[in-house]
Regions:
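Long C-terminal interaction/binding lobes of large macromolecular proteins
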Residues: 2-16, 20-23, 27-420
Length: 420
């Protein structure tokens, strides 16, 4: 579960020319090597995949749904904040006749997007996605010597990849067989087969594509394959994908007239938290351990929480969020820059995920954690606005260094973050 390179390989056909394309789980953008089309993958909900059964297998296939979750989990405990990287799957049928998880199947088998052309029967999905975390924690508690879950005030999940995977099985002599392994599923009870198995007809195939052309000027949008934010270098605009098309994103850049600079994205979120009377930077200094020297002339500043707009390991995510929120970067920015020649690190964490991280950052900033953390579940976060800020970092051999504040980020940490 802690293998950071445990993503899937997905096989797809180019919707324009039909050529085969291979994707990784975290990819949002693909380019066809044949017709050169470049498309952004979107969905109106969870993406649905299936594991193809062996072609030589001559059986009536029954597909069983499994929830798949990959991301960072933050648990608020009496002892403090604990985090871990999760990579798990869970049977979504509501019965225990099949394996409870997919195990290593998604790493050893190539997946495909679920499509109307797929033949077979589908077991009904009964367990909603928001119920799987309680089941995961129950399993964790049974296996752990320390019964921590009873003291969890709240959980926050950041940077998650969530999908529904259909695994192939078949029935033979009143037993379920794993179609990939071509072997019977181990029995979990004396009752080997219920009188009936609930099936469903899949009607929603919620995957579609957007052309990566700027809606404003028609130029090619720039972004790496993992990017959730795309940049137009022609009209100097920034865009995010949605089910209804690309939408413009407000952004700022701290421009530096130097070479060897990479601009790294962070979300800057203006926030009011009425339950804690937090509206300004002075309010934050009141409940946080912020030195007076850092608070000079800032009493009336609006409160902004910061978060990386890219995926990184939880320790680094917390450090960057806390550091920029307590001592935000002060300097001249522009939202109408000439960005055609600038080097941008890809934004892989959407604004919705950054907003989810506000309580996590708050729990690390406040002095009286025993008082604040238990009430975090009931605290309402009122987001006024959010801005994508590109901060300049000087490129070094093994790290990048923030130009103004001089903190560093290891290049390997950024590389690993792209696989989360």
């Amino acid at each position: 579960m802690k293998n950071l390179n445990s993503g899937w390989t997905i096989e797809e056909l180019c919707p324009q020319c039909g050529a085969p394309i291979t994707l990784q789980e975290q990819d949002h953008i693909f380019s066809c090597n044949f017709c050169k089309v470049r498309l952004y993958i979107i969905s109106s909900g969870f993406l649905r995949y299936y594991i193809p059964p062996p072609k030589e297998l001559n059986e009536d296939i029954i597909y069983a749904p499994y929830w798949r979750f990959k991301g960072i989990s933050f648990n608020y405990l009496k002892q403090g904040l604990k985090h871990r990287i999760m990579d798990t799957s869970l049977l979504a049928t509501g019965h225990d006749l099949l394996p409870t998880s997919l195990g290593f199947r998604t790493q050893t088998q190539k997946l495909k997007f679920l499509s109307p052309e797929l033949k077979g029967k589908f077991l009904k999905q009964k367990i909603p996605f928001n119920h799987i975390f309680s089941k995961i924690e129950q399993t964790k508690t049974r296996l752990s010597k320390k019964k921590e879950s009873s003291s969890v005030f709240e959980q926050t999940f950041i940077g998650e990849t969530t999908s529904l995977i259909y695994a192939p099985f078949y029935l033979k002599n009143y037993k379920f067989y794993d179609a990939v392994l071509n072997s019977p599923v181990p029995e979990k009870s004396k009752i080997n087969m219920p009188k009936s198995v609930p099936l469903e007809t899949i009607k929603r195939f919620n995957r579609s594509f957007l052309s990566t052309l700027c809606p404003h000027c028609g130029w090619d949008l720039y972004g790496e394959k993992e990017s959730c934010i795309l940049i137009c270098r022609n009209c100097n605009s920034v865009w995010k994908a949605s089910s209804s098309g690309f939408k413009k994103v407000k952004f700022e850049i701290f421009l530096i007239p130097k070479d060897n600079i990479i601009y790294v994205p962070f979300w800057k979120i203006q926030t009011n938290i009425a339950d804690l009377n937090l509206q300004t930077y002075a309010d934050l200094a009141r409940i946080a351990n912020i030195p007076k020297a850092a608070n000079n002339n800032r009493d009336k500043e609006k409160l902004y929480f910061w978060a990386p707009a890219f995926k990184v390991a939880p320790n680094l995510f917390l450090r960057l969020s806390k550091q920029l929120t307590i001592s935000p970067l002060m300097g001249k920015t522009t939202n109408e820059p000439e960005i055609s020649e600038k080097y941008f690190f890809p934004a892989t964490l959407p604004s919705t995920e950054a907003i989810e991280s506000i309580k996590v950052t708050l729990s690390q900033i406040v002095i009286n954690k025993k008082k604040i953390c238990p009430i975090l579940p009931n605290i309402k976060i009122d987001v006024q606005k959010y801005i994508l800020c590109y901060l300049p970092f000087t490129i070094r051999a093994n790290e990048i260094i923030q130009y103004h504040m001089r903190f560093s980020i290891n290049k390997n940490a950024l590389k690993i973050g792209k696989t989360l």
